[in-house]
Structure formats: structure tokens, C-alpha cells
């Protein structure tokens, strides 16, 4: 990546999308790091649709382990757990724990 951005550069980059709604008053208590994690989850949700990961109620779900989030965001285990919790408290995601070392299902 260069220091300066040119008009021709826009098509050469892949971007994560973060909904503008996350920057409104309702979500002011959600940290910027949690919003970034949410952007990663949204990006993966498109892959879940492509893979047909849809439950009986028609809801798209995904698997995104704490370890995977750590690798993407370069945060420790405790920090990632806190970020997932923030998203749950803000009603942005629902995690269904499966137990026995299996990753949670994320809606």
C-alpha cells in the first residue's frame, strides 16, 4: 500500500464493510474494536450464504472461533471474548454454544 491514494487504487483493494448504523447513538457503547469484529463477521456471513449455512427458521449462521478472531485482529483470548460479549449485549449477534470443544454457532 502506498502513502497516497489515487482514483485507480479503489478497485485494487478488498474492503470490510461496517454498517453506518453502528456509529449512531444506539451503539455508542460498542467499542471500535467490537465494531471491527462485527465487520469481519458480516464479511464471513456472505460466505455462509454461499455455503448454504441456513437453519430451519431461514436464519444464516456461521462458525468463527475465538482463535480465528485472534489471528485476524491480533488480540489476545481475553480481549476477543470481551468483544464477542459486547456484540451480544448490543444484540448484534447471538452465539449458541455447542460444547465439547466445538465452535459456537453465530447468528
Where are each of the predicted segments found?
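Short recognition helix of helix-turn-helix/winged-helix DNA-binding domains
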Residues: 1-66
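Winged helix-turn-helix DNA-binding recognition segment
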Residues: 27, 44-107
